[in-house]
């Protein structure tokens, strides 16, 4: 039988339940170690199907899915996957250049990016907000003095970061609005989404945002700024307004019935032009 300490330290194994250890062991034996990226996506679809999750119904099945050890696998995987590491390094380098004093990674998962930022900027307060924090992730964060997990946002931040978060929630604009109200005026919201069907937990009713996300946030009061890796920075301009953003969402969803069949190089500018007229 494979020894999990080949991939996970004994100290961290002690923080993983025997049931979850057995599940991880099955995955590592199945793939001869860590799966490849596309294989991880496929493995993450398995409990979604087993639990019979419905992307239109946010019930206990969804809660069970996000508590499944597949998310521990995901967290461990991205900590050693070279492309994922390089993406986080580039995000970190951009954050460092902005010189924030208080940063929060919202939906930060395993907290890898937060730890990178904390190590690079030891005088900066870095928080991680994660509804399902794993003890292994919290233990790793505990090794970086200025990084800590918190149950919710509090006060005002110079920067909020959300990578691969909003494609998982039924009303992402509401969540952006609520979180961005903790962003100081002139502060930056770094967002990277994947509104594409690479995994079943990416809600298909949100795929229209592939062409309209920036516009929706702009009318909310978050001005699109520079592109950062596969995401974009948005700067808070003043008071935020949710209703205009939801109106953009309504029109975007209607346009998607047609634009989803067009190449992105056509669908995106067409959507932008039509939304400007609405």
What are these model-predicted stretches?
Residues 169-178:
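A short, conserved alpha-helix within the catalytic core of class I
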């Amino acid at each position: 039988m494979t020894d999990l300490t080949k991939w996970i330290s004994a100290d961290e194994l002690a923080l993983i339940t025997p049931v979850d250890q057995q599940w991880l062991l099955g995955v590592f034996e199945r793939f001869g170690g860590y799966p490849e990226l596309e294989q991880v996506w496929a493995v993450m679809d398995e409990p979604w199907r087993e639990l019979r999750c419905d992307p239109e119904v946010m019930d206990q099945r969804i809660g069970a899915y996000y508590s499944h050890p597949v998310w521990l696998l995901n967290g461990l995987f991205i900590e050693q996957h070279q492309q994922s590491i390089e993406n986080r390094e580039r995000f970190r380098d951009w954050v460092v250049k902005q010189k924030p004093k208080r940063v929060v990674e919202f939906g930060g998962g395993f907290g890898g990016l937060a730890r990178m930022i904390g190590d690079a900027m030891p005088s900066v307060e870095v928080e991680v907000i994660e509804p399902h924090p794993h003890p292994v992730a919290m233990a790793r964060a505990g090794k970086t003095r200025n990084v800590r997990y918190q149950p919710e946002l509090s006060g005002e931040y110079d920067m909020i970061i959300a990578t691969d978060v909003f494609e998982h929630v039924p009303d992402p604009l509401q969540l952006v609005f609520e979180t961005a109200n903790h962003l100081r005026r002139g502060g930056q919201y770094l967002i990277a989404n994947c509104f594409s069907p690479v995994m079943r937990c990416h809600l298909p009713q949100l795929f229209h945002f592939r062409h309209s996300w920036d516009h929706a946030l702009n009318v909310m009061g978050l001005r699109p700024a520079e592109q950062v890796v596969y995401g974009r920075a948005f700067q808070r301009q003043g008071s935020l307004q949710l209703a205009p953003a939801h109106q953009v969402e309504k029109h975007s969803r209607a346009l998607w019935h047609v634009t989803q069949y067009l190449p992105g190089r056509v669908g995106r500018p067409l959507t932008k032009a039509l939304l400007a007229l609405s």
